[in-house]
Regions:
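Short amphipathic alpha-helical segments embedded in low-complexity Lys/Glu-rich regions
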Residues: 63, 79-83
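Short, positively charged loop/turn segments that connect secondary-structure elements
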Residues: 70-80
Length: 199
């Protein structure tokens, strides 16, 4: 396709459509999860505030725009700055993507810790499927026992950060899942082989 205004417009339109499809697929994947600890009305108001940003937006853009905004959850009150990494390394394709991150504060705080630790690596690129796999692993840990103090999430995020610092590279998503499964089994949680953590 020639590089002209029409081809650039078509490419931008296709990119937006693919992002919407990914967001919808992620929402469908999450439909079986328990309700997030943040009130739906509050999330809707938060998403409306994000519409002033131009997407895709970096974590730095989000924090600059709404970083001091408080989000109340069952676990307590968090600012967006505590949940979204202040970095240009992570981008959000839409307000829905930011909302999806913020609606599970303990997972969001752990992901922020991981993303910020990965910035220290010279050639690491924590994006796409690896980032999604890390987040899905943490969500699965949260779903296993929603009543605990999120010790599993903290243990695995600490393990990932230690690996980044000690080995100076990102652990593979399978290694993260394997470590999460070890943690679960060591703490008496049953993991079936057909589940995400069942490696």
């Amino acid at each position: 396709m020639a590089d002209n205004k029409n081809s650039r417009d078509k490419k931008a339109h296709d990119d937006e459509r693919r992002q919407r499809e990914r967001d919808m697929a992620e929402e469908l994947e999450r439909k079986d999860e328990k309700e997030p600890p943040v009130d739906e009305a509050e999330l809707t108001a938060f998403e409306t505030e994000l519409e002033s940003l131009e997407f895709p937006a970096t974590g730095t853009d989000v924090v600059a725009a709404v970083g001091d905004r408080e989000v109340e959850s069952d676990d307590g009150t968090y600012t967006v700055e505590e949940l979204v990494p202040d970095t240009d390394e992570e981008t959000f394709g839409s307000p829905t993507a930011v909302r999806a991150r913020v609606q599970r504060p303990t997972v969001a705080a752990a992901m922020k810790q991981i993303v910020e630790a990965s910035e220290m690596l010279p050639n690491a690129d924590l994006r796409g499927s690896q980032l999604e796999a890390y987040e899905k692993t943490l969500r699965e840990l949260k779903a296993i026992d929603a009543d605990d103090d999120d010790e599993g999430i903290q243990a695995i995020s600490d393990w990932i950060v230690e690996r980044i610092r000690d080995k100076e590279k990102l652990p593979g998503s399978r290694a993260v899942r394997r470590q999460a499964a070890k943690y679960c089994r060591a703490n008496g949680y049953q993991i079936r082989n057909d589940e995400w953590l069942g490696i």
